[in-house]
Structure formats: C-alpha cells, structure tokens
C-alpha cells in the first residue's frame, strides 16, 4: 500500500511539473510576449520599481510573469497575470 501511495505522489508531482512547464512554454511562445513583457516593465517602473528580471511562470495553474524588482532599497517579488498584466502579488523579498 505504501509503495502504491508513493508511486501516486511521484506521478502527481511529475504531472504538475509538466503542466507548469507547458504553461511557461505557452507564454514564451506567445507572439505578443515581448510587447507584453515591455508593458509590464513600464507598468512597474511607473510604480517606482527598478526591474531586475521578469520571467514567465505559472501561478495556481495560470500563466503569469514573475518579476524581481527594487524600490527604496528593498527587493520585491511581483506576480502579474498574463496577458492582462494585473498585479496578483506584490511583496517584499526578505
């Protein structure tokens, strides 16, 4: 029974990782990706951030852009929905 449970957990983890990779691939394959990325940079710069990097990722199974940015000497982790670029999460990275 323990072996079956362990195998199930491993299979589920692999399937989840595969789904996340597929979502990332979809974002990077979007023909408007570079435009949307540039819009995200401008949006965050207007809010006073200096952008360190922005990458495609998934958040709760949805495509997002994850940004590392600095403001007032502090580092922030910011998650924007993709492609509409609404801020989902904005927190100080300790």
PLM regions and their residue ranges:
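Cleaved targeting-peptide boundary
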Residues: 18-27
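Post-signal peptide N-terminal regions of Sec-secreted extracellular proteins
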Residues: 20-21, 46-49, 94
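Classic N-terminal secretory signal peptides
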Residues: 1-19
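A short, surface-exposed interaction/processing loop segment used at functional sites
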Residues: 85-94
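Amphipathic, hydrophobic secondary-structure cores in small proteins
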Residues: 52-55, 59-66
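Short, non-transmembrane alpha-helical segments in secretory-pathway proteins
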Residues: 27-53
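Short acidic/polar mixed-charge low-complexity motifs
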Residues: 72-76
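Conserved histidines in hydrophobic membrane contexts and catalytic metal-binding motifs
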Residues: 62-68, 79, 85
């Amino acid at each position: 029974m323990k072996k079956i449970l362990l195998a199930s957990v491993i299979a589920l983890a692999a399937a989840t990782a595969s789904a996340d990779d597929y979502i990332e691939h979809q974002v990077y394959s979007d023909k408007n990706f570079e435009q949307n990325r540039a819009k995200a940079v401008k949006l965050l710069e207007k809010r006073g951030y200096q952008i360190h990097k922005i990458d495609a990722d998934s958040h709760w199974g949805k495509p997002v852009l994850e940004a590392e940015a600095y403001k007032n000497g502090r580092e922030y982790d910011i998650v924007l929905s993709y492609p509409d670029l609404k801020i989902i999460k904005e927190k100080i990275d300790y």
